[in-house]
Amino acid sequence: MRGCLQLARWLSAAPNWPASSLLKAPGSSFATRLFTTTSSYKAKGPSKVPMTDLEARISAIPIERYRNFCIVAHVDHGKSTLSDRLLELTGTIKPGMNKQVLDKLDVERERGITVKAQTCTMIYNHKGEDYLLHLVDTPGHVDFRAEVSRSYASCGGALLLVDASQGIQAQTVANFYLAFSQGLELIPVINKVDLPSAEPERALEQLEQSFELDTEDAVLVSAKTGLNVEQLLPTVVEKIPAPIGDCKRPLRMLLVDSWYDSYKGVICLVRVFDGEVRAGQQVVSFATGIKYYVGEVGIQYPLETPQTVLRAGQVGYIFFNPGMKRSKEAKIGDTFTTVGSEKAVQPLPGFEEPKAMVFVAAYPVDADHFEHLEDSINQLVLNDRSITVQKESSEALGAGFRLGFLGTLHCSVFEDRLRQEHGASIIITPPSVPVKVVWKDGKEDIITNPNRFPDEDDVRMKVAELQEPYVMATLTFPDEYLGTVIELCEANRGEQKSLEYFTPTQVILKYELPLAQLVDDFFGKLKGGTKGYASLDYEESGWKPSNIVKLQLLVNKAPVDAVARLVHYSQTDRLGRQWVTKFKEHVDRQLFEIIIQAAVGKKIVARETVKPYRKDVLAKLHASDVSRRRKLLEKQKEGRKRLRAVGNVVIEHKAFQAFLAK
């Protein structure tokens, strides 16, 4: 009560302050919390807050001097390190302040990879004039292609980065064609020229031969030491076109990304194409029709820095006040405009939704933590809409979720984020891929959960065809490993499509492979067989007929639903033997015999037995009492048989956890 009275006195002392200015008032953390959480607050119009020196400098820059660009490359070619040097060069951060400033997730710093495309605004003075540069650091791994594609929507050009010692790799090729198809201006950059093994001339030759790029404007740099990095920004200013937009038109704003903040709620990353947006405006979503009041707008500099306004051509963040009621309201690719301008504004085309192609089941280690796991998953999915989520239940592991991902690394990173950012203790099943069932009546179903796969009789009587997804894999590696790579691809049911040398010693090999083989540690085997020199990229190539079966684990003839997998028939013997051997290691002995089997339908493909505890029923007998001995042994045998028939096998939760661990 005392706190409320003090707040009332404080507010009455400044009756003319608009609520939005309280949000911006220095040191007003309590006021901020009050006005950003209450649903009764409604802003009455754009707020007027004094400009900071930074914002005054930005407001003086016309859209003709905006440059939006990204850095694209194969994984581990130095994108994040180069981003650091550019931020230092423009004075956005202090030299040596932090390594990989734009890699904000713990999992990114641990693995040394970029998972989420991150943005930053910079101001660069070129020939006496300020330029507003907007940089996007994109992921390099194929699993995060959707992040790269979305980043291109807010850019007018890209730095195509190539490692001077490794040359063009698989994802360099993929990222080039993706950027080229969207009409981005590409600037070749050769990185790591300070390495003893660097061959910049060879890398430039590869760029000319593979992409027909003019390498006269290529910049040779070392992001690690900063060598020649200062030559990049003049090239960006002169080569990359300014964004097209008009501040006088009605607001047209694209939602590029979103994430969750425990204090502010859902925060949206937006690209303003036309008009301007400021705190206090009421905007409406074209996708949902829901109206919101803008609570705050700002830029990433590199941290969230509030601004009075975001204008046409800028990329920044906004959050609403009151915030979005549900995280699903933040639809990536949605267009926003001011209320009343809906008919005057044409919504932007948005993004193609990526399809999840790798599925796992996730269960809490402790069933009491199910709600915490659900909240954690929903918060992470807000930041990554390519993940699909469905609730499911298992007799062995209880309530859980069926999660869909773009690839195995995508899945692994999500699992790490659940553990690190939310403290979740989870059990994850091995990854599997969907199967298409074509019924004889012409209907088609996509099966992502093995427990919904038709049984053996239905497959024989009602199913016309089973199909599995295939991908077109592009592999690049030194020619000395050609035999090893071809052997690996053939062993994984691959079909060779093309083979070409893009240099006298470097090979590009294309194979059509089942996606199921790719998620079964294909990349690890490829790296091992080529001593780490091979790189891999892939894209979907459709569905093909296949002999798919359901492999089950049986414990005393009862199926363990959490372990079932859909596999190609040729893999059943190998996988079945692995399953029963591994599961036996984690099952405790009991009073009766436990039979562990791997089965396809009614056919048993592998078996192991856990022997029971032995009780010596003959201990008190006289050695000569043969008939009594036989009678007691027969009685014990019958008792064990009866116990096995009616007794439930008690399998500890940790046994499943150990069995499903990689």
Swiss-Prot record:
Its main location: mitochondrion. GO terms for molecular function: GTP binding; GTPase activity; mitochondrial ribosome binding. GO terms for biological process: positive regulation of translation; translation. The keyword GTP-binding applies. Belongs to the TRAFAC class translation factor GTPase superfamily. Classic translation factor GTPase family. LepA subfamily. Promotes mitochondrial protein synthesis. May act as a fidelity factor of the translation reaction, by catalyzing a one-codon backward translocation of tRNAs on improperly translocated ribosomes. Binds to mitochondrial ribosomes in a GTP-dependent manner. This is Translation factor guf1, mitochondrial. It comes from Emericella nidulans (strain FGSC A4 / ATCC 38163 / CBS 112.46 / NRRL 194 / M139) (Aspergillus nidulans). The lineage of its organism: Eukaryota, Fungi, Dikarya, Ascomycota, Pezizomycotina.
